[in-house]
Amino acid sequence: MRGFSTQNSTFVDGVRDLGALSRDVFNLEQVEVVKGAAGSDIGRGASSGYINLVSKLPTLEDAISGTLGYGTADKSNLTADINQSMSDNSALRLNLMRRDGDVDGRDTVENSSYGVAPALAFGLETDTRLYLYSQHVRQNNIPDGGISTIGMDGFYNADASLNAGAEVDSDNFYGSKSDYEDVEADMFTVKFEHDLNDVTT
């Protein structure tokens, strides 16, 4: 945000997210962006602001939705969002995700991931509410360090010998085929809310 790293200024449901993970949006209800100095709000963090990711939680409205997609570079995408009420004030929600595919214009690079996010809610539409929810994400990727910008329009380096270099093919892969990025992330959250009055929770 405005030239500052937000690595330590990213929150999930109001809790600081310290994991270095490329997060998927399959289980997000909304993204809140707060701009400006926010030290009095969140404590230590970037002076540019912070980001809060809000997870999907159960509601009393029964609903099923999903997405299915296929794109270039053999990209495939599948998501499902299932919400089911269990009583007058409790509900269950399940979000699922599966993604596979290569990267456009790049050889060798592949990305694969899946995610499961169950959630339970009790006391919905009452003064006291309890939410129990978790998320499991697994990623199996081949890391891509990109390509050299030598020879591209606008490239400049104080070393004249580099300026004379030829442009490389964007399909070239400069990593190792045996390299891997194997990520497994689990989160479990308990949220308790109680309405003290009409304006205070």
Q: What feature does the model see in each segment?
A:
Residues V12, K35, L96, L132-S134:
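Glycine-rich, histidine-containing beta strand-loop boundary motifs that form or position
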Residues F26-E29, S40-V116, L124-L130, D186:
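Outer-membrane beta-barrel translocator/receptor signature
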Residues A38-S40, K177:
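Short, P/G- and charge-enriched loop/turn segments at secondary-structure junctions
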Residues R99-D104, N111-D195, V199-T201:
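Acidic/polar loop-and-plug regions of large Gram-negative outer-membrane beta-barrel proteins
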